């Protein structure tokens, strides 16, 4: 029982930690490419900015889904037999 709870706690930490790292790297790369493309073609800044914010929201949504799954495992643990 304690072994399962320890492994679930470790898994929750990995889900949140790796999800945060992945989301931050993705948003950083996307922001860098946005700045590069807006410097190259300044007349497209409005269109690119709209698309960048939509994609940033989708990247954050994927991270928040991972956080929700980690919270499910932490508080309503389906691996522990009742």
From Swiss-Prot:
Membrane topology: Multi-pass membrane protein
Sites marked Reversibly protonated during proton transport: 60
CC annotations in GO: plasma membrane; proton-transporting ATP synthase complex; proton-transporting two-sector ATPase complex, proton-transporting domain
Any one GO MF annotation of this record: lipid binding
TM helices/strands, residue ranges: 7-27, 53-73
Gene3D superfamilies: F1F0 ATP synthase subunit C
Protein keywords: ATP synthesis, Cell inner membrane, Cell membrane, CF(0), Hydrogen ion transport, Ion transport, Lipid-binding, Membrane, Transmembrane, Transmembrane helix, Transport
CDD domains on file: ATP-synt_Fo_c_ATPE
Main location: membrane
Record-linked Pfam families: ATP-synt_C
Disulphide bonds in the chain: none
Keyword Ribonucleoprotein: no
Complexes and interactors: F-type ATPases have 2 components, F(1) - the catalytic core - and F(0) - the membrane proton channel. F(1) has five subunits: alpha(3), beta(3), gamma(1), delta(1), epsilon(1). F(0) has three main subunits: a(1), b(2) and c(10-14). The alpha and beta chains form an alternating ring which encloses part of the gamma chain. F(1) is attached to F(0) by a central stalk formed by the gamma and epsilon chains, while a peripheral stalk is formed by the delta and b chains.
Protein name: ATP synthase subunit c
Lineage, uppermost ranks: Bacteria, Pseudomonadati, Pseudomonadota, Betaproteobacteria, Burkholderiales
Gene field: atpE
